[in-house]
C-alpha cells in the first residue's frame, strides 16, 4: 500500500491536471455560453494548484522514482513543469480574447490544452521508452485537434491533416528506433539501456540505425531540418492561439524528450549522434534564416525563425557536456519567453474578422501605440540576438559551449548566419517605426493581457542584463538530475 501511495504522491501534479481537464469538460456541458468564463477560471486554478504541489513536493538534490522506475521526479522535471505551468497560464491570458471572438471559447479548447499539458508532463518525467511515447502521443493527438479547432477555416483543416500525417510518420520512426534499441539491449528502461550500452552491446550497426530513426523522430517534433516541412504550414494555418501553444510550451517537452533519450539513455553513443545533430543544426540555421527573409506573412516568418532557433538549440546538445546541456536549457527558456511575446503582440492586434498575421499589419505601430511598438522592438531584438537582450546571452551561451567542445568552424558559421538572420527581424522594426499605418483602429485588449505582455517583453530585457539567476536555475536542474 505504501508503494502505491508513494507512486500517486510522485504523480500528484499530473493527477491534478487530469482531474481538472475532465472537470472542465463536464462543467462545459452544464454552462450556458455567457457563463463560460468559469471554464477559464477553473483552468487557471488547476494550473496554479499543480504549480503549488510541484513546488511544495520538490526535494533539492533528490531524484526519486515511481511506477517501477518508469516515472522520475528530479530537479529537471520540476523546473520544466513549473515553466510549463507558467507558460500555459500566460498563453491562456493572451488567447482569451482571441478565442472568445472566434467561437473557440469552449470546454474542449481548455480540456485539450490541459490534456496536452499532461502529455508534456509525462514526457518530462518519463524514464521508460513506453512512458515517453505515451506522453508524446497524448500531446500529439491533442495538438492535431487544436489545430483543426477553427472548423470554419479551411486552412486550419488542411494544416491539421498535414500535421497528422507527418506526425504519424515521425511517431512510427520513433517506435522503430525504440524497437531496435530494445532488440539489442533487451530493455525499454532508459537507465537500463544506458547500463547495457556501457557494458558493450554486440550489434553496434543496429544500435546506430536505431539512433538514426530516433533522431529523425526527435527532429520532427522539434521542427529541425530536414524534418521541418510541417512547421510553416501548421504555424500559418492554425489559429494564432494554437500556434502560440505549439511554438512555445511544446518545445520544453521536446527538450526534455531529448535529454531523457540522448543524454540519460544513449550518452555512450554520443559520438554517433553528435554528427547527426551537427548536420541538422547547420541546415536548420541556414534554411531557417534564408527562407525567413522571403516571407511576407508574420506567422510563416516566425515559423522559419523557429527552425533557425532549433538549430542553435542543437548546438548545445552536440557539445555533449554539462555546459552544453545547461546552455541548451537556458536557450529553450529564452526561446519560449520570446515566442510568447511575439505571438502575444500578434494576438493583441487581432480582432474579430481580422488576423494581424501579415508583416504589413505592423506598419506604423509606433504611431498607433508607441508602448506596444517598443515591446515588439525588444522582442525582435531578442530574437535577433542583439545585446543586451536575453536572446543575445542565450546565443552566446550555446555558441560558447560549442566552442569549448571544439566546433570552431560551426560557431563561425552560426555567428555569420545570426548577422544575416537579423535582417528579417529588423525589417519588422522598420515597418513599425518608419512606415505609415494601414489601419488606425484603436488597440483594445484586457488589462491582464496588457500587463503580462509588458512584463513579458521587459523580462527579456532584464534577464539579458542579469542572466545569471536563470542560468543558475538551469545549471541546478541539469547537474542535480544526472547522478
Swiss-Prot record:
It catalyses: a quinone + NADH + 5 H(+)(in) = a quinol + NAD(+) + 4 H(+)(out). GO terms for biological process: ATP synthesis coupled electron transport. The chain crosses the membrane at residues 11-31, 37-57, 82-100, 110-130, 164-184, 205-225, 239-259, 268-288, 301-321, 329-349, 372-392, 406-426, 446-466. Its EC number is 7.1.1.-. It is a multi-pass membrane protein. InterPro entries: NADH-Q_OxRdtase_suN/2, ND/Mrp_TM. It is an enzyme of class 7 (translocase). GO terms for molecular function: NADH dehydrogenase (ubiquinone) activity; NADH:ubiquinone reductase (non-electrogenic) activity; quinone binding. The keyword Ligase does not apply. GO terms for cellular component: plasma membrane. Keywords: Cell inner membrane, Cell membrane, Membrane, NAD, Quinone, Translocase, Transmembrane, Transmembrane helix, Transport, Ubiquinone. The keyword Membrane applies. It holds the Pfam family Proton_antipo_M. NCBIfam families: NDH_I_N (TIGR01770), PRK05777.1-5 (NF004442). HAMAP family: NDH1_NuoN_1 (MF_00445). Belongs to the complex I subunit 2 family. NDH-1 is composed of 14 different subunits. Subunits NuoA, H, J, K, L, M, N constitute the membrane sector of the complex. This is NADH-quinone oxidoreductase subunit N.
Amino acid at each position: 500500500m505504501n508503494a502505491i501511495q508513494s507512486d500517486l504522491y510522485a504523480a500528484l501534479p499530473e493527477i491534478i491536471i487530469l482531474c481538472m481537464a475532465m472537470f472542465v469538460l463536464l462543467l462545459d456541458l452544464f454552462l450556458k455560453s455567457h457563463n463560460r468564463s468559469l471554464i477559464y477560471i477553473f483552468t487557471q486554478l488547476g494550473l496554479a494548484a499543480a504549480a503549488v504541489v510541484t513546488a511544495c513536493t520538490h526535494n533539492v538534490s533528490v531524484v526519486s522514482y515511481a511506477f517501477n522506475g518508469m516515472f522520475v521526479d528530479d530537479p529537471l522535471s520540476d523546473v520544466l513543469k513549473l515553466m510549463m505551468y507558467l507558460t500555459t497560464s500566460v498563453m491562456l491570458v493572451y488567447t482569451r480574447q482571441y478565442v472568445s471572438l472566434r467561437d473557440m471559447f469552449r470546454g474542449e479548447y481548455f480540456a485539450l490544452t490541459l490534456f496536452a499539458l499532461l502529455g508534456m508532463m509525462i514526457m518530462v518525467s518519463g524514464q521508460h521508452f513506453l512512458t515517453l511515447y505515451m506522453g508524446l502521443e497524448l500531446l500529439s493527438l491533442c495538438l492535431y485537434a487544436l489545430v483543426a479547432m477553427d472548423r470554419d477555416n479551411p486552412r486550419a483543416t488542411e494544416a491539421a491533416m498535414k500535421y497528422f500525417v507527418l506526425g504519424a510518420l515521425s511517431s512510427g520512426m520513433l517506435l522503430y528506433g525504440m524497437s531496435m534499441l530494445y532488440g539489442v539491449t533487451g530493455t525499454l528502461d532508459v537507465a537500463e539501456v544506458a547500463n547495457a550500452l556501457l557494458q558493450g552491446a554486440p550489434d553496434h550497426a543496429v544500435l546506430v540505425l536505431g539512433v538514426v530513426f530516433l533522431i529523425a523522430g526527435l527532429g520532427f517534433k522539434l521542427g529541425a531540418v530536414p524534418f521541418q516541412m510541417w512547421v510553416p504550414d501548421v504555424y500559418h494555418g492554425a489559429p494564432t492561439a494554437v500556434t502560440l501553444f505549439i511554438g512555445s510550451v511544446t518545445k520544453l517537452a521536446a527538450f526534455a524528450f531529448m535529454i531523457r533519450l540522448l543524454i540519460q539513455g544513449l550518452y555512450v553513443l554520443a559520438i554517433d549522434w553528435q554528427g547527426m545533430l551537427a548536420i541538422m543544426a547547420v541546415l536548420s540555421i541556414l534554411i531557417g534564416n534564408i527562407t525567413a527573409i522571403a516571407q511576407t506573412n508574420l506567422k510563416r516568418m516566425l515559423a522559419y525563425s523557429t527552425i533557425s532557433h532549433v538549430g542553435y538549440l542543437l548546438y548545445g546538445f552536440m557539445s555533449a557536456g554539462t555546459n552544453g546541456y545547461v546552455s541548451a536549457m537556458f536557450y529553450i527558456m529564452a526561446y519560449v519567453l520570446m515566442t510568447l511575446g511575439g505571438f502575444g503582440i500578434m494576438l493583441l492586434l487581432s480582432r474579430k474578422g481580422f488576423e494581424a498575421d501579415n508583416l504589413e499589419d505592423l506598419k506604423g505601430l509606433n504611431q498607433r501605440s508607441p508602448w506596444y511598438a517598443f515591446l515588439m522592438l525588444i522582442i525582435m531584438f531578442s530574437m535577433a540576438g542583439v545585446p543586451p537582450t536575453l536572446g543575445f546571452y542565450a546565443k552566446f551561451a550555446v555558441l560558447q559551449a560549442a566552442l569549448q567542445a571544439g566546433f570552431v568552424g560551426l560557431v563561425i558559421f552560426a555567428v555569420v548566419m545570426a548577422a544575416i538572420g537579423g535582417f528579417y527581424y529588423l525589417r519588422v522594426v522598420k515597418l513599425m517605426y518608419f512606415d505609415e499605418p494601414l489601419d488606425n483602429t484603436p488597440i483594445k485588449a484586457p488589462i491582464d493581457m496588457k500587463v503580462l505582455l509588458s512584463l513579458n517583453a521587459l523580462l527579456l530585457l532584464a534577464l539579458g542584463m542579469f542572466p545569471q539567476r536563470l542560468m543558475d536555475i538551469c545549471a541546478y536542474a541539469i547537474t542535480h538530475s544526472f547522478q
